[in-house]
């Protein structure tokens, strides 16, 4: 990770600075605690950059801890993908990977302690009844008829739960707090529920599993976390976080702080809705390049540095807001414009023949891999009598604003010669099949000797040397800025989110490596697809265009 990446400031860092200055803490210890029930998305990237970035900048520690308390929804596949995503973003966790399930024995003991203090009880209301008894924001809840069981009875019943003697859903352990609390989260929340499911870490050892709010705070305390950072939807949960730690025998009491989550326009962040996109085959998987998942962004050709820069630019605040997709794409363009090697590709080819060049003539032209970075070296690209240019780069007639090839006029071929269009050949439908040109042999990368002005420049590939390729032109998956607000978010799918074209690339791209993004000159940024591209079948994903076309469309 570059040292040039500016260290941001925000209200959380100000709190940390004050804690260190006052001596409240002598070091900083954070954690990133994802649930392994899906793939991480760009919103998680913000949390990763915040937690790991703070640990890095304060020479502290950051744990990677999987909140694996629901075996029904979790899978080792997600565990491995999350580890890859964190490392791809440029971070390493402190020590071994941790799991909430590592603490199941301690959590069970703390549950027994709460029961022993009369602060937890086994409830046999159904889930629906618990919801009814909980009340609303404007009306208090009411006590469960099982709330006043004795400590001895609750201990015995909780043991029966642990031994699997209750059916799933027939009993749970609840905290005994206040059913009239103005905060619904404090109205006797569930601490443990029964699930007869094999766990990816603990197997079948347990059939009772702790809830997030009980697990999260205790895991933080056991690991010595100093600053527990969550998104704003957990703000009310902080009261329960503190209540649990205040009522058990544990020496460490971390403090929870909340920050705004990332809401990105033209995207969905809900795991449930993302899962629906996958299950309904709207996209081809969690790593589909149109998905906001980190694996999808990586496959599309986004760089880790650009994602980190995006997270830095949007900052950390306490106010929820929607971030424009253009802000993310701007970070990608800035990074790739600076670092992506250049190459030429023709996405909609039409044949071009240079009449005054010998049929067997082949010239290797030296071209820079980057126009402003000589340290990136050069490449040799063959130039021959027959070329392909993009169909949009030729017109039989055009006005003065059209700076490309026009019949009877000149244009420059990128890093090559000036050519003049002399005539065209068409098929029976009137479609141009071949453009016949002449070239000025004295104009290789220089102006014509007679001083005539040639303003336009177009890209090209040699027809006999170019490699056939498939181009996947990815765009925003949704056609509206806030698809989540729609009654049926699937109705807002952009039908043009994927357009496939077939054309040609210069031969230097034969060994294009997935996740290495190129600027295809005048076309955009592309990378070889990790799933489908091979030496015999090149497939390139468009990472992002050279400019924001959506801004124009909105005008």
UniProtKB/Swiss-Prot annotation:
ATP binds at residues 35-37, 41-47, 231, 261-262, 269-271. A motif ('KMSKS' region) lies at residues 268-272. A motif ('HIGH' region) lies at residues 34-44. Keywords: Aminoacyl-tRNA synthetase, ATP-binding, Cytoplasm, Ligase, Nucleotide-binding, Protein biosynthesis. Disulfide bonds: none annotated. Its EC number is 6.1.1.18. Pfam families: tRNA-synt_1c (PF00749), tRNA-synt_1c_C (PF03950), tRNA-synt_1c_C2 (PF20974). PROSITE patterns: AA_TRNA_LIGASE_I. Its main location: cytoplasm. CDD domains: GlnRS_core (cd00807). L-glutamine binds at residues 67, 212. It catalyses: tRNA(Gln) + L-glutamine + ATP = L-glutaminyl-tRNA(Gln) + AMP + diphosphate. It comes from the Bacteria. The keyword Zinc does not apply. GO terms for molecular function: ATP binding; glutamine-tRNA ligase activity. One of its GO terms (cellular component) is cytosol. One of its GO terms (biological process) is glutaminyl-tRNA aminoacylation. It is found in: Cytoplasm. HAMAP family: Gln_tRNA_synth. PANTHER family: GLUTAMATE--TRNA LIGASE, GLUTAMINE-TRNA LIGASE. Monomer. Belongs to the class-I aminoacyl-tRNA synthetase family. This is Glutamine--tRNA ligase. The gene is glnS.
């Amino acid at each position: 990770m570059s040292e040039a990446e500016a260290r941001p400031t925000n209200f959380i860092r100000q709190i940390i600075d004050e804690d260190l200055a006052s001596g409240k803490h002598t070091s900083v210890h954070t954690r990133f605690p994802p649930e392994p029930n899906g793939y991480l998305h760009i919103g998680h990237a913000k949390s990763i950059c915040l937690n790991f970035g703070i640990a890095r900048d304060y020479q502290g520690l950051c744990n990677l801890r999987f909140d694996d308390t629901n075996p029904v929804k979790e899978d080792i596949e997600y565990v491995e993908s999350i580890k890859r995503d964190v490392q791809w973003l440029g971070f390493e966790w402190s020590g071994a990977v941790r799991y909430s399930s590592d603490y199941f024995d301690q959590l069970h003991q703390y549950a027994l302690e709460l029961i022993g203090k009369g602060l937890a009880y086994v409830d046999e209301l159904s889930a629906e009844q618990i919801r009814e008894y909980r009340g609303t924001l404007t009306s208090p809840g009411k006590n469960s008829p099982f709330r006043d069981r004795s400590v001895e009875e609750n201990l015995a019943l909780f043991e029966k739960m642990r031994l699997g003697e209750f059916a799933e859903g027939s009993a749970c352990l609840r905290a005994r707090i206040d059913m009239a609390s103005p905060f619904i989260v404090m109205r006797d929340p569930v601490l443990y529920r029964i699930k007869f499911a094999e766990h990816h870490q603990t197997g079948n050892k347990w059939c009772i599993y702790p809830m997030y709010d009980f697990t999260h705070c205790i895991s933080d305390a056991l690991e010595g976390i100093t600053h527990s950072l969550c998104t704003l939807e957990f703000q009310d949960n902080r009261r329960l976080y503190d209540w649990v730690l205040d009522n058990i025998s544990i020496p460490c009491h971390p403090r929870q702080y909340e920050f705004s989550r990332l809401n990105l326009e033209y995207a969905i962040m809900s795991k449930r809705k993302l899962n629906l996109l996958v299950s309904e085959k709207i996209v081809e998987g969690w790593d589909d390049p149109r998905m906001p998942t980190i694996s999808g962004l990586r496959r599309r050709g986004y760089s880790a540095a650009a994602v980190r820069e995006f997270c830095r630019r949007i900052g950390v605040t306490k106010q929820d807001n929607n971030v424009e997709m253009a802000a993310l794409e701007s970070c990608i363009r800035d990074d790739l414009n600076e670092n992506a090697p250049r190459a030429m590709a023709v996405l909609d080819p039409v044949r071009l023949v240079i009449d005054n060049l010998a049929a067997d003539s082949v010239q290797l032209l030296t071209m820079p891999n980057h126009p402003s970075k000589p340290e990136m070296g050069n490449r040799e690209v063959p130039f021959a009598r027959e070329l392909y240019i993009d169909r949009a780069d030729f017109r039989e007639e055009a006005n003065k604003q059209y700076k490309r090839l026009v019949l009877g006029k000149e244009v420059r071929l990128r890093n090559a010669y000036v050519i003049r269009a002399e005539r065209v050949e068409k098929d029976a439908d009137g479609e141009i099949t071949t453009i016949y040109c002449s070239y000025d042999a004295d104009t290789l990368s220089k102006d014509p000797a007679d001083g005539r002005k040639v303003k336009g420049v177009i890209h090209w590939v040699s027809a006999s040397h170019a490699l056939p390729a498939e181009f996947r032109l990815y765009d925003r998956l949704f056609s509206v800025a806030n698809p989540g607000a729609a009654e049926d978010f699937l109705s807002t799918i952009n039908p043009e989110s994927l357009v496939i074209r077939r054309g040609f690339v210069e031969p230097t791209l034969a060994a294009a490596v997935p996740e290495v993004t190129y600027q295809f000159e005048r076309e955009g940024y592309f990378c070889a697809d990790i799933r489908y591209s091979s030496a015999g079948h090149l497939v390139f994903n468009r990472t992002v265009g050279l400019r924001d076309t959506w801004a124009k469309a909105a005008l």
